[in-house]
């Protein structure tokens, strides 16, 4: 989406070096995002959780392999982290969030109330009505992912507003999510 109202992503350690130009969303674009999320809500929330979990695990695999180095480079340039900090934040912690969250979701869904003989007590989980709004931080790419993906794993839809100072790495996250 191009609005014509643009901003620049610069390196924190070299403000003269422009990494990217992005289009700022206004009220119209925010409403479009909400409408798109609500349109996807029924299908996404009714998708079996195992299928949603498999998508999350696929994202983790892509981050561990195909996109690991581009995400590291993006975090180093856009958030001024050294290679060790970038590796911990971007792929490692992000992959852990996705894999552990999938495991913990399976435990949540498996946990059922006690049933007396001849009675079946059962808990059925459902997504929230509406959407989750994620306003993600400037300093941790992994948290930017987790604030969106954890609710999505549980069947919710999310509207994501990345920090303007972390748009570079968050753009690559979005590309991985789309794949």
Regions found by a protein language model. Name each.
Residues 4, 10, 14-109:
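Glycine-rich loop-to-alpha-helix module at the N-terminal edge of alpha/beta enzyme cores
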Residues 1:
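Active-site loops and adjacent core secondary-structure elements that bind or stabilize anionic groups
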Residues 76, 105-179:
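Rossmann-like NAD(P) dinucleotide-binding subdomain of oxidoreductase/dehydrogenase enzymes
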């Amino acid at each position: 989406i191009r609005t014509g109202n643009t901003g620049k992503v610069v390196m924190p350690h070299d403000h003269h070096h422009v990494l990217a130009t992005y289009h700022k969303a206004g009220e119209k674009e925010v409403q479009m995002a909400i409408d798109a999320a609500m349109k996807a809500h029924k299908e996404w929330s009714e998708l079996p959780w195992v299928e949603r979990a498999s998508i999350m695990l696929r994202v983790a695999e892509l981050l561990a392999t195909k996109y690991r180095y581009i995400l590291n480079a993006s975090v180093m340039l856009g958030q001024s982290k050294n290679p060790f900090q970038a590796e911990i934040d971007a792929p490692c912690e992000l992959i852990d969030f996705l894999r552990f969250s999938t495991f913990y979701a399976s435990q949540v869904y498996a946990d059922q109330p006690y049933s007396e003989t001849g009675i079946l007590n059962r808990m059925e989980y459902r997504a929230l009505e509406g959407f989750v709004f994620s306003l993600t931080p400037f300093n941790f790419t992994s948290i930017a992912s987790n604030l969106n993906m954890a609710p999505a794993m549980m069947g919710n839809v999310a509207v994501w507003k990345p920090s303007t100072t972390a748009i570079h790495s968050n753009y690559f996250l979005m590309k991985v999510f789309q794949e």
